[in-house]
C-alpha cells in the first residue's frame, strides 16, 4: 500500500480519502476489470460524473472551491489525532503525493500542529505560473472569470503557502513530470521558511523512484529523533 513500512517503523498512519471514496478505488478508471462488480461500476461512474474535473469545482470563489473541503478534512483529522491518548502530538507529520502533496503543504501552513511534511511531486504549486512565462496553470482559466479564478487560486497555492511553513519539509520532484512541473515544485521549495530538503528524481515523471518511501521514513526518523 501507499503507507507500507510506516507502521513497522513505529508510526501510526491515519489515511484520509478527501473525496469520500475508498483509497483503493482512487484510480479505478485506469484499472481493467474483466467482471466489474457493482462497487467498481459505482466508482467508475462517480469518476466520470460528479468527480469529473474535480479540481475545477468552485474555482472562482475561495469559499466555494472544492479543496476548501479537502483542507477542512485534514484539520478534522488533526483534531481526531489530538483527541487520542496513544498519539504523540509532538510527532505528527503530513505525508502525501501529487494532490496529497500539495494539500499537505497548504495544510501545514494553516494548521501549526503539523511538525513535519513529506510531499512527493506536490500539486497546487505556482498556480499562475503561466502569467510569468513559466509552464503550467493556464488551463485553469477555461470556463470561468479570469480575475476571479486568479484571486481564488491564490488561497490554494502551495508555493505561496510555503513561506508560512517553518517546520522541516522533505520534497521529491520529478524532472520529467508534466503534471506537477519541476519548476512549480521548486517555486514552493524555494519559499519554505524552515529546514528543507529536496530530492531530484531525474528520470521520473509523475511518481517516485524505488526506495523513496524508505528514505522518507529515514528522514522522518531524523526529524523526530526516533532511535532504531
What are these regions (language model features)?
Residues 3-7, 12-72, 129-136:
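Cap/lid segment of the alpha/beta-hydrolase catalytic domain
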Residues 86-98:
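Alpha/beta-hydrolase fold nucleophile elbow
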Residues 101-148, 200, 208-211:
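Hydrolase active-site cap/lid region
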Residues 146-161:
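Active-site nucleophile elbow and catalytic-triad environment of alpha/beta-hydrolase enzymes
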Residues 164-165, 171-173:
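Short beta-strand/loop motif that positions the catalytic acidic residue
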Residues 167, 181-189:
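Short alpha-helix in the alpha/beta-hydrolase fold that links the catalytic acid
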Residues 175-180, 206-207:
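Acidic catalytic loop of the alpha/beta-hydrolase fold
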Residues 186-228:
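C-terminal catalytic histidine-bearing segment of alpha/beta-hydrolase fold enzymes
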